[in-house]
Amino acid sequence: MKKKKWSKVLSVFLVMVTAVSLLSGCGGKSAEKEDAETITVYLWSTNLYEKYAPYIQEQLPDINVEFVVGNNDLDFYKFLDENGGLPDIITCCRFSLHDASPLKDSLMDLSTTNAAGAVYDTYLSNFRNEDGSVNWLPVCADAHGFVVNKDLFEKYDIPLPTDYESFVSACQAFDKVGVRGFTADYSYDYTCMETLQGLSISELSSVEGRKWRTVYSDSENTKREGLDDTVWPEAFERMEQFIQDTGLSQEDLNMNYDDVVEMYKSGKLAMYFGSSFGVKMFQDQGINTTFLPFFQENGEKWLMTTPYFQVALNRDLTQDETRRKKAMKVLSTMLSEDAQERIISDGQDLLSYSQDVDMQLTEYLKDVKSVIEENHMYIRIASNDFFSVSKDVVSKMISGEYDAEQAYQSFNSQLLEEEAISENIVLDSQKSYSNRFHSSGGNAAYSVMANTLRGIYGSDVLIATGNSFTGNVLKA
């Protein structure tokens, strides 16, 4: 096999990633038999080992499920796919159909499964390919909107916002009494990206908006796709107006999450953009807090959401009916209500895109109940390009370097730029090693990588957390 050249794959070999295997005892079975009986699930975060992975294994005692921490980047799975190492089941949080398109032919079509049929069509459309196939399904949503300090509104006798106009009025009223009406952690790419999209959800969800999103995500589209000239120019105009209405400036670009939380706790900030988890967090600290949606220009109200992760299955499973059935059982369990309850934080509301999961809202989301009941939960466009370009362009809008027109042109041109391909060789191995665990010999890939690192550092002993590598070692 040729030498593998890819800078991002460095994470496979050098970043310490915890991998936990929840396997039944296999006795003296051959490695081939163990491999055939094992369903490998790559989880995007170690947090899923706390409650989620153990629950799935408990529900499936007759199936050997091997959990491995993979990577929250679809480029990682593209690399595995190109080199014959794609796992049985994949999960990824930072996701877009655009970035997932190169994997399409290697993933199972789930469009006719009960799991896909349970997802509300308005949400499933975000995962449907141009040919009608569906490779990825979402688990429950993390809702993002405006975390609001009701105590400050009551203290200064300022009405809670009910639309965009009253939101702006509240910001202006707080400014007069020396309190910041709104800010957010704009040092992060996702805050820049979600604010830009959140202000124009109605338009991005319109016929024209969906038309553009379909073209942008089309797996058959071999050329890079930019922004359209219908929906997006106005989106940047709204962003420009929002910056003016809220008084965002260069200083806000240095704000991180801790800075925002400290301002909020000290009574210096009335509203910030963030996760609904913040409501419970501040309520527990004695601060009367509520959660509000994005107010749209046309009067609609929407929540920005991101699935905690998306799930896909390897198409190779269809070549073995026994393994396919096992994998489908694992998928069904992963998407079950009880399993999804173990994804979210304690006290957080379970917001599912599935009709099979009951909606049971707590007091923390009472002010957005009608929004959720209307299925106004927008799933963000979250390609790698959108993260990086949003950070660059929105930051320059906030600093005053770009107006709406300049921002649109810059964003569009950056989307159309061809990516430079790295030629860095990260490994030159004369032999391949499997990352499967076998009862007779452990994990060969983990062993050889551990020994390689030990040699690099001239150490007799390597101490690592659990199983520290995610992929096969490939022959050069």
Put a short name on every predicted segment.
Residues N135, V168-R224:
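Extracytoplasmic/periplasmic solute-binding protein
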Residues E58-T122, D151-T162, E262-M263, A270-M271, ...:
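Extracytoplasmic "Venus flytrap"/periplasmic binding protein-like
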Residues E423-A476:
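Solvent-exposed loop/linker segments at secondary-structure transitions
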Residues E58, N64, Y156, Q283-D346:
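Extracytoplasmic/periplasmic substrate-recognition and gating elements
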Residues V215-L253:
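Glycine-centered hinge/linker elements that transmit conformational signals in sensory
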Residues C93-H144, P159, V168, E194-T195, ...:
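Hinge/lid segment of periplasmic solute-binding proteins
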Residues N47-Y49, E66-F67, N129, T305, ...:
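C-terminal capping/gating helix-and-loop segments adjacent to ligand/active sites or protein-protein/ligand interfaces
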Residues P87-D88, A116-D151, R180-G181, Q296-M304, ...:
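A structural signal for short loop-to-beta-strand junctions that line the ligand-binding cleft
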